[in-house]
Amino acid sequence: MNKGWLELESDPGLFTLLVEDFGVKGVQVEEIYDLQSKCQGPVYGFIFLFKWIEERRSRRKVSTLVDDTSVIDDDIVNNMFFAHQLIPNSCATHALLSVLLNCSSVDLGPTLSRMKDFTKGFSPESKGYAIGNAPELAKAHNSHARPEPRHLPEKQNGLSAVRTMEAFHFVSYVPITGRLFELDGLKVYPIDHGPWGEDEEWTDKARRVIMERIGLATAGEPYHDIRFNLMAVVPDRRIKYEARLHVLKVNRQTVLEALQQLIRVTQPELIQTHKSQESQLPEESKSASNKSPLVLEANRAPAASEGNHTDGAEEAAGSCAQAPSHSPPNKPKLVVKPPGSSLNGVHPNPTPIVQRLPAFLDNHNYAKSPMQEEEDLAAGVGRSRVPVRPPQQYSDDEDDYEDDEEDDVQNTNSALRYKGKGTGKPGALSGSADGQLSVLQPNTINVLAEKLKESQKDLSIPLSIKTSSGAGSPAVAVPTHSQPSPTPSNESTDTASEIGSAFNSPLRSPIRSANPTRPSSPVTSHISKVLFGEDDSLLRVDCIRYNRAVRDLGPVISTGLLHLAEDGVLSPLALTEGGKGSSPSIRPIQGSQGSSSPVEKEVVEATDSREKTGMVRPGEPLSGEKYSPKELLALLKCVEAEIANYEACLKEEVEKRKKFKIDDQRRTHNYDEFICTFISMLAQEGMLANLVEQNISVRRRQGVSIGRLHKQRKPDRRKRSRPYKAKRQ
């Protein structure tokens, strides 16, 4: 295995795929574009590329130069993973292994775990031999390299090909035991750059060291040389975004519970009204189904013609009768319309029907005064409600990511471990769980109850709100949150790293550009219209900033779980060192072997960060407050905006992985066979000679010197020099 290792490009997509081939999980590689800016998030290590000064790396030996920064203590050197590079062109794998095997919080997989255990306590030279004799590493290394160019014939070896090619080398910067080390496989000892400051991260010191090195190599002009590249080994951002989505969906459920509990406390008489209305619904639906004909819904016709039956049609039908079960599946679904209703849901009677909310909501309309409500009632002002088709749910067709999603589905139940007290007992559950939100009349109290019950089944499905509907009341379906719509952006995959990096990328992703940070939520806007009669104040982000619930809970809504007490107090969940919540009602279930879910890790990390910034004191329970319905709706809008934002980020990461694989296929594909076959076919057809002559003639007409034409300049110089000498005489 000492020969045959190929050169690798300094590309974050290549290194990310190489990490996956090594069997490492939860790690990716990002490119650093700006050394002046601070790195966001945890970083396992840096991989630095620079130009190598020697001519031939195949004949080089490990440098024996030792200075004051070299660590010569065998105990320190052997306890870390530092290996001499004994195989040419293996510096990329050496640099990557130097980062991964010196990090204790990385899932290395079977291959690297076995190597780490086997080489524990070995000398750097022995570790170098272990890397060179690992066929799994060599196979993964060469699988991402460009095809090796063919050697030139011996008669054309006048110029050394090695002298004309520039050689580059990879080294690593890793934090080990509180000190920054530079691990270079071509040096006999690791380089110790010392500890970093108390008020800074290790990445800050590493950036300073790298900038000083670039400045020395370029004579004090660090931005005039592009022969350097820097990459960071970071956690997989897909896992981070999925964990944040789990936390946000649990918090959305908690906010809905708080809103439902507030309505139950303020209006206890509504429960009796709800029961009486439920008893009347079967009779009304039965009479309506016997009198009304079967008609096709206009807004469901395109989807039904293709045979795609959506649950939204059943949800819009409400309590009406369904189509017969013996109907073929390729026929459009028929629904029963109430008497007098048209295809568009508009009553044919010219007299407008006043659509009002239930009495308990109209009496507690916080957006209007009682005088204004009486005027609206006298004028017959109704709220128009138009069905809105939900957007297509996000799905990833990538094969390898589907495997990851299967593991994530198993971990979905981890979000259900956090269950707050005071969960209301909803009524009968409707049969639809399609992830839509329907606000029907007149039982708005069941809106939150049905949505909570559906969300407890599967947190990965967008939560829905469902209420019973009386005859003649139109159904309104609104998606739970605004999904990121794919934009007609440039799908070129020539350079997948152009999609952008989390570390100061100069190019912004088209997905993020198409989605604002805080998109307007159709759920909260529609609920605010139903509850309060207006949504202008909730749609403005500036007004949300000054909302009390958003101001108190907004900074921790995506990093920590919310706890709803029995008295309606909503507060963030404080975690102790053991990872268990201070509230007895919300406790994470400890898994086997002490493993924790991504949700628990995210919550612990978020709590630690809040303790560092002074937001939370260790061991101190977090105080909560009661909020008004309008404040809870603003908080719900904030949660759904964060969900939409993280879903866009997750989709961006998935698309970036896809383009990484496309680039890798283009990089590793051998085009020589196709080129040789094409040229041989041209020669067989007698077209090759003519094409060569045409190419040569075009170059001559363009003034390009061919062959020995440039040697005619010497006689011209002698002719010009003779008159000059004669004039001097």
Swiss-Prot record:
Family indicated by similarity: Belongs to the peptidase C12 family. BAP1 subfamily.
Q: What does this protein do?
A: Deubiquitinating enzyme that plays a key role in chromatin by mediating deubiquitination of histone H2A and HCFC1. Catalytic component of the polycomb repressive deubiquitinase (PR-DUB) complex, a complex that specifically mediates deubiquitination of histone H2A monoubiquitinated at 'Lys-120' (H2AK119ub1). Does not deubiquitinate monoubiquitinated histone H2B. The PR-DUB complex is an epigenetic regulator of gene expression and acts as a transcriptional coactivator, affecting genes involved in development, cell communication, signaling, cell proliferation and cell viability.
> Sorted alphabetically, which PANTHER family does this protein's record hold?
UBIQUITIN CARBOXYL-TERMINAL HYDROLASE, UBIQUITIN CARBOXYL-TERMINAL HYDROLASE BAP1
Could you say what the effect of mutating residue 699 to W is?
A: Slight or no reduction of deubiquitination efficiency towards H2AK119ub1 substrates in the context of the nucleosome
Per the record, the GO terms for biological process are: common myeloid progenitor cell proliferation; erythrocyte maturation; gene expression; hematopoietic stem cell homeostasis; heterochromatin formation; in utero embryonic development; leukocyte proliferation; macrophage homeostasis
Q: How does it assemble?
A: Core component of the polycomb repressive deubiquitinase (PR-DUB) complex, at least composed of BAP1, one of ASXL1, ASXL2 or (probably) ASXL3, and one of MBD5 or MBD6. The PR-DUB core associates with a number of accessory proteins, including FOXK1, FOXK2, KDM1B, HCFC1, YY1 and OGT; KDM1B specifically associates with ASXL2 PR-DUB complexes. The BAP1 deubiquitinase activity is not required for PR-DUB assembly.
Q: Which parts of this chain are annotated as the region Disordered?
A: 301-351, 372-435, 464-524, 575-623, 703-729
The residue numbers the entry assigns to motif Classical bipartite Nuclear localization signal (NLS) are: 699-722
Q: Which residues carry this modification: Phosphothreonine?
A: 493
* Basic and acidic residues bias locations: 599-614
Q: Which portions of the sequence form the region Interaction with BRCA1?
A: 596-721
Q: For the site Transition state stabilizer, which positions are given?
A: 85
* Signal peptide range in chain numbering: none
Where the record places motif Non-classical PY-nuclear localization signal (PY-NLS) is 717-724
Q: In which broad location class does this protein mainly occur, judging by the first location in its UniProt entry?
A: cytoplasm
Which superkingdom heads the taxonomic lineage of this protein's source? Eukaryota
Name positions with the PTM Phosphoserine: 292, 369, 395, 521, 537, 585, 597
Cite the position(s) of the site with description Important for enzyme activity.
184
**Region feature Interaction with YY1, mapped onto this chain:** 642-686
Q: Which organism is it from?
A: Homo sapiens (Human)
In its UniProt entry, what is this protein called? Ubiquitin carboxyl-terminal hydrolase BAP1
Q: Where is the composition biased (Acidic residues)?
A: 395-409
